[in-house]
Amino acid sequence: MDIEIIRKTDPEIADAIEKELIRQRNKIELIASENFVSRAVMEAMGSPLTNKYAEGYPNKRYYGGCEYVDIAEELARERLKKLFGAEHANVQPHSGAQANMAAYFALIKPGDTVLGMDLAHGGHLTHGSKVNFSGQIYNFVSYGVREDTGYIDYDEVERVAKKHKPKLIVAGASAYPRIIDFKRFREIADKVGAYLMVDMAHIAGLVAAGLHPNPVPYADVVTTTTHKTLRGPRGGAILCKEEYAKAIDKALFPGTQGGPLMHIIAAKAVCFKEALTDEFKEYQKRIVENAKALANALMERGINLVSGGTDNHLMLLDLRNTGITGKELETRLDEVNITCNKNAIPFDPLGPNVTSGVRLGTPAVTTRGMKPEDMVEIADIIVNVIRDENYKEKAKERVANLLKKYPLYEDLI
C-alpha cells in the first residue's frame, strides 16, 4: 500500500495505520480470532470495487453496471460451495453476527425457543446472550460443558432439547478447544424436530483442510466468518441446503442488509481460492501442530488448560491456581509484547471483565512461519510472566529475539 497517498490527505490516519503495522510486526499475536491476510487478499480489499453499489444478487441487481462485480460474487459463491461441499452459498454478510442474524430470520420467528451454547461455557454473544439481539428477540435456552472434563455434555444437550422443544439448535463456539460432534447434534435435532444451525466461524479453516469434521452434511444452515482460521477479510458467509436458499438470501437482503461490500466479497473470493490449495491444507496442519505444542508446553510447566488440552487452534488457560486473573495476565503479556485476550472459563467464579482465564490461539503465529519449538519458547515466556512480576524486561528481550526470525509484511510500507 502507498501510505504517502493517505498521509498527504490525512496524516493522522496514516500515522495510526503505520503504528498499527509496527504493533503487528513487533508483538506475538495469540488472539485466537485474529490472523494476517495474504497480500492478495489485502490488495483486493483496497480495489476499485469499493466504489460499486450492487443491491441484490448476481444477475438480479437493483443497480446497473454490475457485470464485473457479478463475476466477483459468483466466483466467491462457487469457490465457497466447492470448499465445503455445500449446495448453496451466500457471501454477502458483513460479519459473522450478520450471518447468524440472517440465519435466524430465515428459519424461525421472534419468540421461538432456540438452544445454544452458554456464552460462559464457550459460546458466542449471538448464541443467545441477553445483551445481544439473539437473546432479546428469541427465547434462548443453553447447554454447556461438563465441569469434570470441560467437554460438551451431549447428554445434557439432549435432555434440555427434549424438555424445551426448541425450533432451532445452534452448535459451534468461540472458545471451545475440542472437536464438535455434529452428527450427534443432528440426531438430537431430529429427535425434537428442530433445525440445526452450525456456527463454524472459528474452525472454518480446519474444516476446509479436513482437520475437523465438516458440519455441512449434518446442518440445515452453516454460518462462518471469513477471517480467523480461514485467513480472509473480515466478513461472514452462509452455507445451506438448496431448500433453504431462497429464505436465507431473502433474510440477508433485503431482510438485514442493503448493499453488499463488493471489495470485501472480491477479497473473500481470493481467500477461498487460497483455501482450495494443498498449501493451505499444510498451513492448517501447522496451526494445529503449533496449538498442541503450545498447550503441551504450558501443561508441562504446571498451567491447567480447560479440557486438558486442544484439538483445534485454540486453548483456554485456567488460572485459578496461579494467583493471577485473566485480566491481569492479559495486561502483563501485553507489556512484554504478547497479545491475547482474557476469557471466562466454564464455571468461572469471576466476572467477565476480570475472568479466571485467558484464550490463546495459533493462526497468526503460524502465518508468520513459527514452528512447534517456537511454541515451547512462547509457553516458557508466558509461564515466567505469570510467576514473576519482575520478568518483564527479560520476557521482552526473548519476544524480540523470536520475532526477528519471522518478519511480517516487510514491503507493505
Swiss-Prot record:
Enzyme class of the recorded protein, top EC level: transferase
EC number of the protein: 2.1.2.1
Pathway(s) where this gene product acts: One-carbon metabolism; tetrahydrofolate interconversion; Amino-acid biosynthesis; glycine biosynthesis; glycine from L-serine: step 1/1
Reaction(s) this enzyme catalyzes, per UniProt: (6R)-5,10-methylene-5,6,7,8-tetrahydrofolate + glycine + H2O = (6S)-5,6,7,8-tetrahydrofolate + L-serine
Cofactor(s) essential for the protein: pyridoxal 5'-phosphate
GO CC, alphabetical: cytosol
Binding site for (6S)-5,6,7,8-tetrahydrofolate: 119, 123-125, 243
UniProt KW Cytoplasm keyword: yes
SUPFAM superfamilies reported for this sequence: PLP-dependent transferases
Residues with N6-(pyridoxal phosphate)lysine modification: 228
Annotated positions for site Plays an important role in substrate specificity: 227
UniProt-listed GO biological process terms: glycine biosynthetic process from serine; tetrahydrofolate interconversion
Location in or out of the cell: Cytoplasm
GO molecular function terms listed in the Swiss-Prot or TrEMBL record: glycine hydroxymethyltransferase activity; pyridoxal phosphate binding
NCBIfam families: PRK00011.1
Family listed: Belongs to the SHMT family.
Described purpose of this protein according to its UniProt entry: Catalyzes the reversible interconversion of serine and glycine with tetrahydrofolate (THF) serving as the one-carbon carrier. This reaction serves as the major source of one-carbon groups required for the biosynthesis of purines, thymidylate, methionine, and other important biomolecules. Also exhibits THF-independent aldolase activity toward beta-hydroxyamino acids, producing glycine and aldehydes, via a retro-aldol mechanism.
Name this protein carries in UniProt: Serine hydroxymethyltransferase
